Amino acid sequence: MRTASTPSPDSGEHTMNTPHSHAARLTQLALLTAVALILFLVEAQIPPLVAIPGVKLGLANIITLVTFYLYGRRDALMVLLVRIFLGSVFSGQMLMLLFSLSGGLFCYAVCALLYPRIPLKKLWLLSMIGAVCHNIGQILAAILVLGTADVIWYLPALLISGLISGCFTGLVAGAVLARLPRA
């Protein structure tokens, strides 16, 4: 496992020369995905903090950020995609799959470009940028699905909430990474 302070921009530092190391890596990624899914499902049961559709903390994104810094881009994408799909299935919100994917993939693309350049001590900044991009991606999906730009009026509230929730999830992800044993 890589150290949290030295992110690899690609697929992490794991070399899969042995079946054991490959199995261990897959097991660790499956556990991270399960934790992300649990956080997503628990958060889905919490009443909204504000009366604005789409505003939530994004607790599952803590795990995506941790995966970026421990395993790299490719594995972070896999954890994200599996969590989004299974989260939609298990929560019974298959109609929200498009919005989750559009927000998640836009956020991922921006974070994948930026995370090698943002040190762990500023993970909160990457998380804030990612949260804002997630909200922009969801608004773009809503415009396409609804065929109107009227939903753009949600954007200011979503951007503000993205900054706040992104800062929170980034600080938590940074604290998690700081407490993991160094490899």
Predicted regions and their residues:
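Short helix-perturbing small/polar motifs within transmembrane alpha-helices
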Residues: 27-32, 38, 79, 100-133
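Generic transmembrane alpha-helix motif of multi-pass integral membrane proteins
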Residues: 59-73, 110-115
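Transmembrane alpha-helical segments of multi-pass membrane transport proteins and ion-pumping complexes
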Residues: 37-41, 88, 104, 108-112, ...
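Interfacial aromatic-anchored transmembrane helix boundaries in multi-pass membrane proteins
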Residues: 40-57, 82-112, 145-150, 154-155
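Residue-level signature of transmembrane alpha-helical entry/exit and packing/kink sites
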Residues: 21-32, 57, 61, 76, ...
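Alpha-helical transmembrane segments and their cytosolic interface
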Residues: 2-33, 38, 153-183
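Hydrophobic transmembrane alpha-helices
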Residues: 17-66
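Membrane-embedded alpha-helical hairpins and interfacial helices in multi-pass inner-membrane proteins
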Residues: 53, 93, 97-98, 116-183
